[in-house]
Amino acid sequence: MVSTKTQIAGFEFDNCLMNAAGVACMTIEELEEVKNSAAGTFVTKTATLDFRQGNPEPRYQDVPLGSINSMGLPNNGLDYYLDYLLDLQEKESNRTFFLSLVGMSPEETHTILKKVQESDFRGLTELNLSCPNVPGKPQIAYDFETTDRILAEVFAYFTKPLGIKLPPYFDIVHFDQAAAIFNKYPLKFVNCVNSIGNGLYIEDESVVIRPKNGFGGIGGEYIKPTALANVHAFYQRLNPQIQIIGTGGVLTGRDAFEHILCGASMVQVGTTLHKEGVSAFDRITNELKAIMVEKGYESLEDFRGKLRYID
């Protein structure tokens, strides 16, 4: 019997697919829809300490091979998501969910994480070090010195399972440098990758989104080769106890298969979920299982990380 079960940080999930933070996760109603779908779990919208309106609209546009967005971290604030998760873990104690977080400053990041640390939350926390769409706020994970300092400060008090969402890296030296930092800390996972920052999409003679004069994060099929490269580069470099969530360009079961082949333990769906709705989880899962049957694989462990090279 073919199984797409997986585990992260010792938590088991019935399916390796889930939503990506930012899609179908703003409201409790959306999270419930993902929870009740074929997805193995969900991650919340990336929460700041307080409610954020985000950037002015239009700020998201589906385009032929993906999407462009400059959402600006709209969310309902930490308490909205944390309270929901605390309630949910009592009702569905057999399941584990992800809480995505970011501070608008290092101080706010620590305030948020300390609140989670002091709460009864028993799930997985994802710290977003890679949002490209907040004007005036750089992507932290491109600054290795700052990343190292923040992680050192966080792990001085945070003892719950924690992972980080990363921007795409493009240089082999940067993979080496980033992995050397991450390997110093008890991270449970890294999520590769957030959207490729500051792309530009034009229709006729105009940009298609309002913020930043049309510059926005690129997602979807455009970014799959970059996402796969990041997944595999970190799979090769990170300590085995730091698992990888693959995100970027997952339209089909084949795309999910490739993420796992590159080393991903879980696969997130973003642009496709926005375009297709939660039925995408059923379709992609069935396509992935069909590939596994064809190849004689019974579990993800049979092929995870076993990408072949040409001699």
Swiss-Prot record:
Keyword Oxidoreductase: yes
Co-factor requirement: FMN
Subcellular location: Cytoplasm
GO molecular function: dihydroorotate dehydrogenase (fumarate) activity
Pfam families from the UniProt entry: DHO_dh
Cofactor annotation remark: Binds 1 FMN per subunit.
Keyword Nucleus: no
Binding site for FMN: 45-46, 128, 165, 193, 220, 248-249, 270-271
Pathway: Pyrimidine metabolism; UMP biosynthesis via de novo pathway
EC nos: 1.3.98.1
Disulfide bonds: none
Keywords: Cytoplasm, Flavoprotein, FMN, Oxidoreductase, Pyrimidine biosynthesis
Family that this chain belongs to: Belongs to the dihydroorotate dehydrogenase family. Type 1 subfamily.
PANTHER family, per the entry: DIHYDROOROTATE DEHYDROGENASE (FUMARATE) (PTHR48109:SF1), DIHYDROOROTATE DEHYDROGENASE (QUINONE), MITOCHONDRIAL-RELATED (PTHR48109)
Subunit-structure text: Homodimer.
Function: Catalyzes the conversion of dihydroorotate to orotate with fumarate as the electron acceptor.
Protein name stated in the entry: Probable dihydroorotate dehydrogenase A (fumarate)
